Curated annotation (Swiss-Prot):
Family membership noted in the UniProt record: Belongs to the NhaB Na(+)/H(+) (TC 2.A.34) antiporter family.
Physiological role: Na(+)/H(+) antiporter that extrudes sodium in exchange for external protons.
Entry-linked InterPro entries: Na+/H+_antiporter_NhaB
Keywords per UniProt: Antiport, Cell inner membrane, Cell membrane, Ion transport, Membrane, Sodium, Sodium transport, Transmembrane, Transmembrane helix, Transport
Organism ancestry: Bacteria, Pseudomonadati, Pseudomonadota, Gammaproteobacteria, Vibrionales
GO cellular component terms, semicolon-separated: plasma membrane
Protein name per the record: Na(+)/H(+) antiporter NhaB
Main location, first listed in the record: membrane
The encoding gene: nhaB
GO molecular function, one term: sodium:proton antiporter activity
UniProt topology in membrane: Multi-pass membrane protein
NCBIfam families named among the record's database cross-references: NhaB (TIGR00774), PRK09547.1 (NF007093)
Subcellular location: Cell inner membrane
Amino acid sequence: MPMSLGNAFIKNFLGKAPDWYKVAIIAFLIINPIVFFLIDPFVAGWLLVAEFIFTLAMALKCYPLQPGGLLAIEAVAIGMTSPAQVKHELVANIEVLLLLVFMVAGIYFMKQLLLFIFTKILLGIRSKTLLSLAFCFAAAFLSAFLDALTVIAVVISVAVGFYSIYHKVASGNPIGDHDHTQDDTITELTRDDLENYRAFLRSLLMHAGVGTALGGVTTMVGEPQNLIIADQAGWFFGEFLIRMAPVTLPVFFCGLITCAIVEKLKICGYGAQLPDNVRQILVDFDREERKTRTNQDVAKLWIQGLIAVWLIAALALHLAAVGLIGLSVIILATSFTGVIEEHSMGKAFEEALPFTALLAVFFAVVAVIIDQELFKPVIDAVLAVEDKSTQLALFYVANGLLSMVSDNVFVGTVYINEVKAALIDGQITREQFDLLAVAINTGTNLPSVATPNGQAAFLFLLTSALAPLIRLSYGRMVIMALPYTIVLAIVGLMGIMFFLEPATAFFYDAGWISPSSGDLAPVVSGGH
């Protein structure tokens, strides 16, 4: 019997998502205006934040852009925020949007070089613990100088390459055109290997993801909010590094120790080894690649290597906005490796553009947080505390908790502006402002690894095409991040409470840094 037109509309709404999920989204859309107009806009604002987090948590059921976008459109329509405020957030974060559009596509054109290097690393280091430490340390080191999103884009690109190589062979297909999203042709014998391989890749990706947070917190270029905080405080690269060190150094070493421990104890989804069959396939693939590599292929690797040097130098020296450097990578890589057809270039943009659209929706939610002043009670309560040491610890905790819920750049920006306003009003001293700036920076960067909401790199990983392939869901990410969340949050808090003030006094006495003075930068707005 043919489907009625009414049923067809219902069936088409959110496609293959479960019926209960569709009902939940419709319920949210009905409830929100009622709460906003009849109960309290503040409550409606927090309800919207909770609903948006729900859509992220259900990312494997339905990509969050559609349900989250419907909620955001309604929020603007009923007046929770304005189109102008959403546009303001997008303009304030244009660099992040450019990064996603161009840099991620640029990385795509360097895939051959990345796969070449990482195949050597993966096959060269047999110990899973050492391999995990290598991924975590490399991601941390790169994130101290590059953007965490760029680093995660590299790791995702490599993981997709590794996954598709094995999947092609396990499916009995030639290393040609193959759909690595379908498991139908895989035999039961290799299915166990595939599950173990997925667990292996999941753990490496999470180690790398946490590595971006460990490295990103240490320098002023590591995360977008670091730049904002450094700008507000008037610190340059060296001073920022030194002022953060009393907190970031203990956290970095404890993070690496945690990496080794979770692998050894095989807890929270870690500890999966690379199956022997998979290793053999990768070894065979590497051997085959070496045999069939022509001079033209070698020339491409050399070109990609030179472009990688340009990429790292340009990012470390901040020669241009990250996205524009990414555009230069696309132009150079395609020009010198002979990719000149439009359809060949189009594939490079497939990965990042859905996430770019999702991030725009996220900024609409951030606009609601700003317009409804959802964080104001927390900020006011913390600023009202008289004891300086307690205030430092509370700032760290409050930043951490809010960064788990919202975008950590937005949280950091809001807090540094509030603290700066307090300094201008004479509520706090310049010395206390400097210490609070450290608490804000570490508070937004470290505990935010708890959920994918806080770190854009984690959110990008969760919503990437790779996540469903290796069965990486929101819940699994939270569980796998848990040991790191506990260690990073507690060690960071200990650093703020016990190491920061004496270490800063020592740095002053040693002449490494001097007490800050002078004008502060103007107020900025921002999300991620």
